[in-house]
Amino acid sequence: MTRSSLTTPPPHAGPPEAVPGAPAPGTVLSSHYGQCFGCGTEHPTGLHLKARTPDGTTVEAEFTVGEAHQGAPKLAHGGVLATAMDEVIGMSVYLFRKPYVTGRLETDYLLPVPVGTTLHLRAWCNGIAGRKAYLEAEGRIGAPDGPVAVRAAALFIEVNMEHFAKHGDLAAIEVEHPDYEVNP
């Protein structure tokens, strides 16, 4: 993965700390919003990522490239692959039990991904510095140890729930996450 300095953790960045209430190893992670294109179960043409944390520090997920996800005939659209990387990385910061948003996403496309292929995704955190999380992900064709088709490095920024209330739909947030407090 070719990373810029913006997605490389600074020397003082530390590993993520275990957070009380974070999903335990082996936990299947639920969708954060039913209509999310990446993980939502209610989105008609979404990726429908099914994710879990095998060890409490990484996230693994799969999705099968469908007809609605193609760019060139019978090949996954690069933007869809970038979305898959963004989503699995976003699910990995879910382990910190704090809201984050994508600040930067760098994606390397290594192999074409045909329609009908199951892409096996894995994401992990390389370090945290203040409100910034430095993360990576990879997508492998056909199996968890299959050939790497796509890699990503990302910078995610911690925000408060007020961010989503201000820029999104507060009523939808309250329905999906009644336990979150906005502007407590």
Predicted regions and their residues:
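A generic structural signal for short beta-strands and their flanking turns/coil linkers
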Residues: 32-33, 45-47, 57-61, 101-105, ...
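A short, contiguous structural element within a folded domain that forms the immediate neighborhood
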Residues: 68-78, 83-95
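Short beta-strand micro-motifs enriched in acidic
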Residues: 52-54, 124-128
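Catalytic strand-loop segment that frames the active site of acyl-thioester-processing enzymes
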Residues: 31-76
